Design a protein with these regions (language model features):
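Conserved catalytic-core subdomain
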Residues: 207-278
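A short, terminal or domain-edge coil/loop segment
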Residues: 62-75, 127-131, 135, 245-266
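Active-site cores that bind ATP or allylic diphosphates and position pyrophosphate for catalysis
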Residues: 75-220, 238, 271-278
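N-terminal Rossmann-like or analogous alpha/beta NTP/dinucleotide-binding catalytic cores
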Residues: 1-85, 172-173, 177-190, 242-249
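Residues that form generic nucleotide/phosphate-binding pockets
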Residues: 58, 81, 95, 99, ...
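Noncatalytic linker/hinge segments flanking ATPase motor cores
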Residues: 49-56, 111, 198-199, 235-245, ...
């Protein structure tokens, strides 16, 4: 909506590098669902699984510049569980940072944050000025996994640069990940987009709605009602009659009436307690 409101282009990218989590037909279902709800993207769909050479080239540049090191630490060795989402990774203590033998046998590659790295700062469209001491608050992070797969942060940075992305709007749960991506952009000589991290919808206890028992699937039969509800949650104050209007009519109202300033400074919106939907 932000891109359309500003007269820009909206791009669709399918993050399908992790083949174990990509069920057959899932990408097609994603696209079909977006269409049913009136989302229209510009250009061709970008599949990360088709762009591996770009990622390998970027990784080689980081390795040759000396900004990475091998890490053979297992999750059990570090007493951590595997993170299932970007932004939830634990802080790595630097165990293999000065261990040349780590490159012997299977190993991951980590981006080495400089010891004198200053705070990474940027102005977020919704959260205002954000700063992070990446070395202490994030730690050296994986750019290539132990199984050879390119990690999320590196793939995202490479794609944003290759596609000319100049604005990224996403959830506030990824706010703490952004400084790491900025470090990679600087290492690769890539531009940094404008970022905006929207508030999350959460349960009264703080859990993300998408991960809770009250989350309901998208239903094309009630697409208008669900779109209207999301706009209301996002403080856009859509006219009540739009809840029964065609999907296109909702978008025709929403795009010119987008008011991002109503969301400034908010990390989450806790929904009222109530029974789980039937």
């Amino acid at each position: 909506m932000s891109a359309r409101h500003g007269g820009g282009r909206w791009l669709l990218r399918i993050d399908d590098l992790d083949r174990d989590r990509c069920l057959p037909g899932l990408a097609d279902e994603f696209q079909a669902t977006l269409r049913r709800f009136g989302f229209e993207w510009d250009g061709n769909v970008c599949f990360q699984s088709h762009r591996k050479e770009l990622y390998r080239s970027a990784l080689a540049a980081i390795v040759s510049s000396g900004q990475s090191y091998a890490c053979r630490c297992s999750r059990s060795k570090l007493s951590i569980t595997q993170a299932t989402e970007p932004g939830t990774e634990p802080i790595y203590p630097g165990t293999c940072r000065r261990d040349p033998s780590a490159a012997q046998g299977p190993h991951a590659l980590r981006f080495a944050i400089a010891a004198d790295q200053p705070f990474v700062e940027f102005d977020d469209a919704f959260q205002g000025r954000y700063r992070q001491d990446c070395r202490r608050e994030a730690g050296d992070f994986v750019v290539r996994r132990r199984d050879g797969q390119i990690a999320y942060h590196l793939a995202t940075v490479v794609d944003d640069a290759a596609q000319g992305v100049n604005e990224v709007i996403r959830g506030a749960d990824l706010l703490s990940s952004t400084p790491r991506q900025i470090l990679l952009q600087r290492a690769l000589g890539s531009p940094t987009p404008r970022y905006g991290h929207l508030m999350l919808l959460t349960e009264p206890d703080g859990r993300k709605l998408a991960k809770s028992r009250r989350a309901v699937p998208l239903d094309a039969a009630v697409a208008s009602t669900q779109l209207w509800q999301v706009l209301a949650w996002l403080e856009q104050e859509p006219p009540r009659e739009l809840a029964a209007a065609p999907v296109k009519s909702i978008w025709d109202w929403a795009i010119p009436n987008w008011r991002p300033e109503r969301l400034e400074g908010r990390r989450e919106r806790r929904l009222e307690a109530g029974p789980a939907p039937a």
